[in-house]
Amino acid sequence: MAFGNIQELDGEILKNVWANYIGTPQTDTRSIQVPEVSRTWEALPTLDDIPEGSREMLQSLDMSTEDQEWTEILDAIASFPNKTNHDPLTNPTIDSCSLSSRVSCKTRKYRGVRKRPWGKFAAEIRDSTRNGVRVWLGTFQTAEEAAMAYDKAAVRIRGTQKAHTNFQLETVIKAMEMDCNPNYYRMNNSNTSDPLRSSRKIGLRTGKEAVKAYDEVVDGMVENHCALSYCSTKEHSETRGLRGSEETWFDLRKRRRSNEDSMCQEVEMQKTVTGEETVCDVFGLFEFEDLGSDYLETLLSSF
């Protein structure tokens, strides 16, 4: 029997153990009392407490083999580490910690997702193009589906550069089945966010149906935004000299300003340049000929 490094124990302790074992009366096996585990070595009886008959029997025993076996047993018992009891009934702190960790793992919080009292998950987002108005996205069976709906709405409204999503951007774009183009997702026009109100019609559907319905609602919004961006790009290119057959708003305004300047020049040309013309159409005023200071004094003295 080998339990590691064997250390020799005191012979007096072994004698006390043997004396305690032999000194116990064995008249009736049912009346044998099991020694308590909590008893220490000091509490064991010594050789002085052993009766005379038992002491003579103890001296006749050969302790050569028993000494080594008891030493190995005692060393093995002493080398066993004290293991912590993991029973949840006796150690409730461990069970409570593990339970709280499991609960915290299950209840992960997502951006834009709220749990309803009846177990469903609601998703909503604030539209930054309309002064932070709350936009309802629907109610879903799981928190992941609601978080995905929020991510898709965030990408469509704020764009891929400014959107803060719950999942990775590649996962969201793959779910939307769109090309990863940052300019395509920018929704700066306030009118383009109005179709999001119709997402209330999604209602209490399954996750796939809700996401599909939301995609159908917002696809029209993206097409409208593309048309608006195309018009603005065309108008911008025309203002830079790439003019087409149609007149842009900037050109119309510039032409009106040039017309106003020409009208002012014509009014200036209509002013009288000779002394014979005393009437001017400018602002409906009369202009008199300069007759000199003498004529003015004569005219005033006559009154």
UniProtKB/Swiss-Prot annotation:
One of its GO terms (cellular component) is nucleus. Its main location: nucleus. It holds the Pfam family AP2. It is found in: Nucleus. Residues 109-168 bind DNA. The keyword tRNA-binding does not apply. It comes from the Eukaryota. Keywords: Activator, DNA-binding, Ethylene signaling pathway, Nucleus, Transcription, Transcription regulation. GO terms for molecular function: DNA-binding transcription factor activity; transcription cis-regulatory region binding. SUPFAM superfamilies: DNA-binding domain. GO terms for biological process: ethylene-activated signaling pathway. Interacts with MED25. Probably acts as a transcriptional activator. Binds to the GCC-box pathogenesis-related promoter element. May be involved in the regulation of gene expression by stress factors and by components of stress signal transduction pathways. Belongs to the AP2/ERF transcription factor family. ERF subfamily. This is Ethylene-responsive transcription factor ERF091. The gene is ERF091.
